[in-house]
Amino acid sequence: CAAKLSQMDRLGIDISVLSVVPLWLFHWTPAELAQDFCRQANDWLANFISGSDRLAGMATVPLQAPDAAAKELTRAVTDLGLRGVQIGTTVNGIPLDDERFKPFFDVAEESGSTVSIHPCYSGKPPPFQDYYMKNLTGNPLATAITASRLILSGFLDRHPRLKVILVHAGGFMPYQIGRLDHGFQVRQEASAHIQKKPSEYLRRFYFDTITHAPAPLTFLVDLVGQDRVILGTDIPFDMADTDFAHIIEQAQLPPSAITAIESGNAMELFNLG
């Protein structure tokens, strides 16, 4: 805990919302093993953040067993004081809009728990093994695919109050939303389950700032609004954005946007006030 707080001090971070690493999502293991692991991981995280009021946490759940995941989320939020949950983009290859996950998302929505979606691979890896593309290209692609499904399947209409974060600034999704809108207009498959253009669903999501460059961050804030973007770092990974302050400054955002992105939005989203 002391080392984490010291790191935050060096970076100028007042409060951090922590989650387990994606490798620990354990969506691909037998359900019983995942249930036991998630319970221990959440207990550990709750104990870790209890050492400081500058730390908060997000749970992990055995989503391959949706009823058990719903129960663990309830325990993590109610008993442990965690502020939400992190899940993968798929669960052992099954997309999140599949009806089998409804019990979990119902509880997340009813409890007001924020759901952060992070790329997670299981089974056969994506065909991006060269040049570190599994991360550089595969991660934002996985997020874009999942976000597309959540929009086009009608999932967001079925869960109108669910709070969802798309990490890595939404992957490729925000930058190709016009393509989905065009498909909605010309293809029956893309309009069968929704009544509005896909772009009208973008503000249902929250997006972190991890663009690694100011220009795409400027575009993102202009596209979705300053109230839908929160500061993200990806610490402690090699792809972490520890230069976030400079990037936000170079994005030439108005002072109100900077305040919202650096503090206000996350304070409200995670009930940190």
Q: PLM ranges: what are they?
A:
Residues 34, 38, 42, 144-148, ...:
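Amphipathic, non-transmembrane alpha-helical scaffold segments
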Residues 18, 57-59, 117, 166, ...:
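Structural beta-sheet core signal
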